Amino acid sequence: MESRGLTLRSRTRRARPQISAPKPISGPLPPNSKSTDSGQGNNVSQAVSRERIPTNGATSDLVKRRYSTRYNQAPEFDASAPPVPGLPAAASKYGGLGPPEASKKPSSDSSGPPQVDLNALRDPSLPVDRSNLLANATEEEIEEYQNNLRKVRNRTSTDLQQNVYQNRTQFIKISKEAEKLKGEMRTLRTLMAELTTALGQTAIGNAPNPMSPTADDWVPKRNANRSSVANLESMWNVQLQTLWKTVEGSQKFLPVAPGRHIVMETGQWVELDSATWKPRRPVHIVLLNDHLLVAAKKRKRVDASNHRGPVPTKLVAEECWPLQDVDMIDLGANMGTGAAREEAEERGIANAINVRVGSKTFTYRHDKRDSSDKGELLATFRKAVEDLRRTLRSESDTAIKPTDGFGYAGVKHSVSQKLDLNASDASRDKPEVRIDVDGKQQNLRWVDGQVDELDIDIALQRFEEAVSGIERLRKLARGLKGNSYAQQIINSKVDERAARLASVLSRALADTHSFLNATKTNVTWLTRLGFEDQAREAYLKARSDVISKRVRACVFEGDLPLYIFQVSYVYFTLIKNTINIYQQCFPAVLTSACIKWAKHHLDGFNALLTRQLSSVQRGTTVWQKCIDIVHEHADSLTEVGVDFVDLVAKGLDLHDNGGEKPQMTRSESLISGLADAARDHAF
């Protein structure tokens, strides 16, 4: 049988070709590529992990081509090339092909509760009505947002108030510096004017003839004699020290003061007796810019056995007066005519002057009858007095300026007036009035600075510092006995601040009258300021208002004993507490005012009690119950040492009508009549 014939025997089968799994590639898969069989993922991964024998064939090549993808090679970029610039911000406003940009604002779900944006609130063009910040917020988040806004508002208000106080302090400092600069400029003008005058007089006295060939040599000499302002002040100090050495006892009359200097010094004067015109003693007259000093010539004590020649003399200060208190009269101007004039000329009255200081009168005569010292002294004295008056007037104008104010506007107005440096020219060319403060010389600007500090303490309610400052300035004013002008200015300023502070303390006392410590503190401050009467009146008035308010709160609802209980409790409890606090806050000498106040309110209570019991039968149970309640409450006054038992319910007790038997009411009399009728019927 041929081999190619049909047979039932099994033949050897050829192995079928296996399709190899897809080989992994180095590049990423396309986004649209998907796995052909997701259910066989695990089998494929296991098949890939095993090593397989590569098979060759057309079928495998076709399958490889089917499951393979070719990618182009990535371009090579230069690392040194600059980066690509970003898109401008304006490009985001226009729509494009790209996906829409996600919103930058965090949602309420992801970012939590809304926060207060201070930068947005500072924007004046903020559209408040269009804001959608709280559109999706819960009620708790809205309340929290409101609380945050309130905190921001309170913090802003506090910052604004602190800025106002800081600006006020800066304004005050600026005003002080301006006043100080103004005074320095005034002093500089004065010194320069006096220096110019002195140099002019020196030039006139030392200038040679212009026709002289040495005229050119005089110019450098004049320039060499010029001195600075500081040297002029030093020269004045040297003059005073020389005066102290020359005139014994002059230092106690003329201590060192800024601007004090000698204007004129003249000798060869004789003091005359005002009644007999006889010479008493030789004197030496020294005229300063603010005082007039008279020194007497006295002999020195020397040993007569060892001394030969004339006896030496010394100058001793006898009289010294403020220049504004002195009047100097020329006696030679009113000598008359005829024999009286001849007699006056023989006595030397033509060269005599009369000095008046208050009620005292002094007469001085110059020894040289043909000398011009008297006329020069009179002219220099008048000029010095006029200069001193102009200086005092300048200080008065500066002090009268309204520089006081509590608010921001008041300070601004005061500073604007202080900065007026173009005041009258006549008030800025002379030295200022000086006062002695703890051994140091101060001017009135120092007083203004202390007053400004008082204003700040009062505005900030630093009462202890304000009261201490007022006491210090008052003590300073009491010590200025020789300077009535400065004393008057200081007292006027201090009294104004004291009255203002007393009004503030009185309001505080009326607000805290029920508290012992606060009342005692306020009363102590008012007492130190000298307003004890105002403190007493404010306290008692506040307590009277409380009594009236509490009594009006008691309402009568038909139960008379209950109403009397309420009213009497209010009256006597408040009176007792008032007396108790008053005794601890005020001195014992003022207790009578409190007792008088208590008696006044007790009379008011008696009038109210009489009015309420006018419709009740005297002696009834209701009557007696009301009287007992009143006396029980009145006994509480004995705890503070006051006994008003005889004055309480005066005229309403039973013994006031002679102790007559209590009368029965209509109902009681009716019941009594029925009982009597029943008893008679039984008999």
Curated annotation (Swiss-Prot):
It is found in: Cytoplasmic vesicle, Secretory vesicle. GO terms for biological process: exocytosis; Golgi to plasma membrane transport; protein localization; protein transport. GO terms for cellular component: exocyst; transport vesicle. Residues 128-199 form a coiled coil. Keywords: Coiled coil, Cytoplasmic vesicle, Exocytosis, Protein transport, Transport. Its main location: cytoplasm. InterPro entries: Cullin_repeat-like_dom_sf, Exo84, Exo84_C, Exo84_C_1, Exo84_C_2, PH-like_dom_sf. Residues 32-48 have a biased composition (Polar residues). It comes from the Eukaryota. Component of the exocyst complex. Involved in the secretory pathway as part of the exocyst complex which tethers secretory vesicles to the sites of exocytosis. Plays a role in both the assembly of the exocyst and the polarization of this complex to specific sites of the plasma membrane for exocytosis. Also involved in assembly of the spliceosome. This is Exocyst complex component exo84. It comes from Aspergillus fumigatus (strain ATCC MYA-4609 / CBS 101355 / FGSC A1100 / Af293) (Neosartorya fumigata). The gene is exo84.
